[in-house]
Amino acid sequence: MSVNRMKKRILLLLLVIPALIKAQDVMTETRQELTSPDGAYRFTFYQRAVGEDNAQMYYTLTYKNRPVIEESKLGVLIENQLFESALGIPNDTCHFWCENLKLTETEHQKTDERWKPVYGERAEVRDCYNEMTLKFKKGEGKGNRDGGYDKRKNYFMNIIVRAYNEGVTFRYHFPEMTNGLFLHIVGEQTSFTMPEGTMAYYERWAQGPYELRPLKGWGKEESERPLTLKLPDGLSVALLEAEMVDYVRGKFR
């Protein structure tokens, strides 16, 4: 065997091994998919193992089998240690709050109805989408009852995903805790990993001037939303935020 051929085989082996490792740490039992009514959009959710007991949430999005959002993280950043300590509830040991969420149930439903707006260009609007609700639980009921107060730590979180023919949405939903525990949200892990070569119409403030620039090299600069993007394959994407009623507005960094 020549030296060159040996180098090629070694290189091939080195390339294959990381790919196998990456595939193996995907928890296949958590993989869930949702498609739009016309089948064009496909949202895929799954978790990857982080150590022995924890897992990180990820998602991808394709349009007609073309990548729109590559593997990206899902999750919120929550700091409850001080509140839990004050109540005598065991603190979390995971690095991120969402790392030890267990997927307990997945619900699917379809909606196709019409509603009449108060004003606008159309007298009737069709509301047609497929919905998937991912239900998570945190904690295994560890703790005790002290003087009637339930000190067992059980948190619940849902991710509600809707796929329309026009696009895909998702939101975090926190059902009310039965023992009065609340959540101190300090940030998000939510990310949008776009294909290499994507360009963004950067806007520093609302109604400010637009600047077409690469996604790299922003530093600490932030862009207003919605953020319009041009993918290298010709697709255009808009990242939006909705129902800003009881939550802070976001920016893209």
Which residues are covered by each model-predicted region?
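Bacterial Sec-dependent N-terminal signal peptides
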Residues: 1-29
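N-terminal accessory beta-strand-rich subdomains and adjacent acidic, glycine-rich linkers
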Residues: 27-253
